[in-house]
């Protein structure tokens, strides 16, 4: 069997077509070539409308190519030249989307600015130039307030008070070295520190001395005669403690004086020092017993609050000096913003106080005595 594309003299094995048939059938082309053994010749018929190839055309001595046979099967491949065009179009679309998003964000920003300046959610739209002008005016007002605060600080000479100490317990922010300590920043830091100190001191109760605490604990037991007994016992305890302290002090003084004056005397006699201490104790108990029951009830507090169980033994000064937890950088920034806002809000009242103090320091005319009396009566009422 001979194939198209081969010369007449070339011989190939008979199963060569069987090897190539599945490859031709597996292509996307619907046209298959097959040999007909009934004709007894090597003619090739096609299922297409093309005319069958003649035997003379096949038996020509010139070598025929396989191009006519494969030209009927269209080759399908992806056009690589159309890819750059699609990418450029998508790039243009992306650029337009970015531009739209940018314009939308700008319009949204102006809408937010309008709501902030006018405090109205359903306000009429205002032109961008007017909004920008109003924002600039607000910034100028804030600058004026800041300048006024700096002048107040410089006028009263408060710059030295706002100098930051290196031994501060608060954690410094990461950009503390690059921060410029202007009077405003220093004032805000001081306000934040005082606010933290007030919070820490308000959480801790006021602590009395140990003697007062014991006396109050004894007085809280009951409201009848047992209170008097406990009161008397506490007073006697205090008197005995003070007497023993005075006796020890006087004995030490007498010992030192005797050692200076009489070096030969080795013993120090304490009998003389005990007499005035005992007499003072007796006088104090007599005076306490001489008081009538009404006077003792009068000094008794009417309202006795219950003792708080969560009283910490640390004094309030220590609690106020150290905060509960070291603030982080975010907390410090938030406190700084709050301090600046509070400083700006307190400026008008502070200015009024300064004006009132100046007016009060100047000599003014005496007011009408009748009006002063009426005011005092109203206050007493």
Curated annotation (Swiss-Prot):
Organism of origin: Mycosarcoma maydis (Corn smut fungus)
Compositionally skewed regions (Low complexity) per UniProt: 240-260, 310-331
A GO molecular function held by the record: protein dimerization activity
Keyword Zinc attributed: no
Function: Transcription factor that specifically regulates the expression of the gene cluster that mediates the biosynthesis of itaconic acid and 2-hydroxyparaconate.
Annotated segments matching region Helix-loop-helix motif: 104-142
Pfam family, one: HLH
Keyword ATP-binding carried by entry: no
Bias type Acidic residues, positions: 266-275
Keywords attached to this entry: Nucleus, Transcription, Transcription regulation
GO cellular component: nucleus
Protein's UniProt name: Regulator of itaconic acid biosynthesis
SUPFAM superfamilies: HLH, helix-loop-helix DNA-binding domain (SSF47459)
Effect of disrupting the coding gene: Abolishes the production of itaconic acid.
């Amino acid at each position: 069997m001979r194939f198209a594309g081969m010369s007449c003299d070339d011989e190939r094995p008979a199963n060569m077509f069987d090897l190539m048939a599945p490859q031709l059938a597996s292509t996307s082309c619907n046209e298959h070539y097959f040999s007909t053994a009934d004709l007894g010749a090597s003619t090739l018929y096609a299922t297409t409308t093309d005319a069958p190839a003649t035997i003379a055309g096949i038996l020509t001595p010139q070598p025929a190519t396989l191009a006519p046979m494969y030209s009927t099967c269209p080759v399908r491949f992806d056009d690589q030249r159309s890819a750059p065009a699609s990418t450029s179009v998508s790039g243009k679309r992306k650029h337009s989307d970015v531009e739209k998003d940018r314009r939308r964000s700008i319009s949204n920003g102006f809408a937010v600015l309008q709501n902030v300046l006018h405090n109205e959610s359903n306000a009429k739209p205002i032109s961008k130039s007017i909004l920008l002008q109003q924002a600039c005016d607000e910034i100028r007002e804030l600058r004026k307030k800041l300048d006024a605060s700096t002048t107040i600080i410089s006028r009263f000479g408060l710059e030295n008070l706002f100098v930051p100490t290196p031994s501060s317990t608060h954690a410094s922010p990461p950009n503390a070295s690059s921060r410029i300590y202007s009077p405003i920043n220093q004032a805000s830091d001081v306000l934040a520190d005082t606010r933290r100190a007030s919070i820490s001191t308000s959480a801790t109760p006021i602590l009395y001395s140990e003697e007062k605490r014991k006396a109050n604990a004894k007085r809280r037991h009951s409201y009848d005669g047992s209170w008097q007994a406990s009161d008397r016992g506490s007073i006697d305890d205090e008197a005995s403690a003070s007497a023993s302290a005075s006796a020890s002090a006087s004995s030490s003084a007498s010992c030192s004086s005797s050692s200076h004056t009489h070096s030969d005397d080795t013993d120090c006699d304490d009998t003389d020092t005990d007499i005035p201490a005992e007499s003072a104790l007796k006088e104090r108990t007599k005076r306490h017993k001489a008081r009538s029951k009404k006077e003792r009830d009068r000094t008794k507090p009417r309202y006795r609050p219950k003792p708080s169980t969560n009283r910490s033994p640390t004094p309030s000064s220590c609690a106020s000096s150290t905060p509960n937890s070291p603030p982080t950088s975010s907390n410090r920034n938030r406190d700084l913003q709050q301090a600046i806002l509070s400083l700006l809000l307190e400026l008008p009242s502070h200015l009024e106080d300064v004006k009132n103090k100046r007016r009060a320091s100047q000599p003014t005319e005496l007011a009408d005595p009748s009006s002063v009396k009426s005011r005092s009566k109203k206050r007493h009422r």
